[in-house]
Curated annotation (Swiss-Prot):
This is tRNA dimethylallyltransferase. GO terms for biological process: tRNA modification. Residues 39-42 are annotated as: Interaction with substrate tRNA. It comes from the Bacteria. Monomer. Substrate binds at residues 16-21. Pfam families: IPPT. The gene is miaA. GO terms for molecular function: ATP binding; tRNA dimethylallyltransferase activity. Belongs to the IPP transferase family. It is an enzyme of class 2 (transferase).
Length: 305
């Protein structure tokens, strides 16, 4: 089914708890589309509850792709995402469906529409060696090493940014080239300009923050703490993306007896609210081609189609 106002794909972005999933589901039912995850945490099968993935009933109602498809032990990157998204996009198009990309990870949307820097995969042994040095020598020592090997990257990064400092060193170790040189080389986008309609759902801030708090409480009631306990029992590297999902570090601290459940919930809520605020800023500056709509306007747009 072809709908007016839609080209070859629809992109629905927005902060967490903005009502994106319900909108995408309604659009997919109306247009015969497939909902394609564009959220870096909802790819992890270990975190269905805490990342607010679509329910089993919602996933059964229309095709959903790239949800819960990755183990928490995997350091899933934007490069992995683009590779997987291409396979799904080709599959949906072959079936005549409308691809509906939905999520809040700006880097994934940027990779889809602008292309991705051509950084080759870093071998696991290189990544492990850098992480061991990080644990042994500390982040300041690795930042000093980075300053000697890639002064531009070291000047750009905060001396306490363990993840990005390690990443910059991993790339130099694996390729012999600074990260900036790789970033200057980009692959063609999967969704070039003119091939999609892009929306950013922008709720009123205070209402959004109230929804975030209420949803975190609901996730705890639905078993988020037990979910995190199972994840913690695996003993994974705390620097892995899944281990840094909003709420995971605080709930692990609670499980260790360091803080109360109420304190963990407060931290998880605050981290999620701060992330939502950053999402507004990031999309406004990085992807200005997205049309900003209130949730009411977005629902009206879908109803009009």
């Amino acid at each position: 089914m072809t709908l007016p106002g839609i080209n070859k794909a629809v992109l629905i972005a927005g902060p967490t708890a903005s009502g994106k999933s319900a909108l995408a589901l309604e659009l997919a039912q109306k247009a015969g589309g497939a909902v394609i995850n564009t959220d870096s945490m909802q790819v992890y099968r270990d975190l269905r509850v805490l990342t607010a993935r679509p329910s089993l009933a919602e996933e059964a109602a229309v095709p959903h792709r790239l949800y819960g498809c990755v183990d928490a032990a995997v350091n899933y990157s934007a490069g992995h995402y683009v590779r997987d998204a291409k396979e799904v996009l080709d599959e949906v198009r072959r079936g005549g469906g409308l691809p509906i990309f939905i999520g809040g990870t700006g880097l994934y949307f940027k990779a889809l529409t602008r292309g991705l820097s051509a950084v080759p995969p870093v071998p696991d042994e290189v990544r492990e060696a850098v992480r061991l040095r990080l644990d042994r020598d500390g982040v300041e020592a690795l930042h000093a090493e980075l300053a000697r090997r890639d002064a531009a990257a070291a000047a750009r990064l905060n001396v306490r940014d363990r993840t990005r400092i390690a990443r910059a060193l991993e790339v130099i170790e694996a390729t012999g080239r600074p990260l900036a040189e790789w970033h200057a080389e980009t692959t063609p986008p999967l969704l070039p300009e003119g091939s999609y309609r892009a929306l950013f759902i922008a709720p009123e801030r205070e209402a959004l923050y109230a929804r975030i708090d209420a949803r975190f409480d609901a996730m705890l009631a639905d078993g988020a703490l037990e979910e995190v306990a199972r994840l913690a029992a695996r003993g994974l590297d705390p620097l892995l993306p899944a281990m840094k999902a909003h709420g995971v570090p605080a709930l692990i601290r609670h499980l260790r007896g360091e803080i109360t459940r109420e304190e963990a919930a407060m931290i998880g809520k605050a981290d999620t609210r701060h992330y939502a605020k950053r999402q507004f800023t990031w999309f406004r500056h990085q992807l200005p081609e997205f049309d900003w709509l209130t949730p009411e306007q977005a629902r009206g747009w879908v109803a009009f189609l």
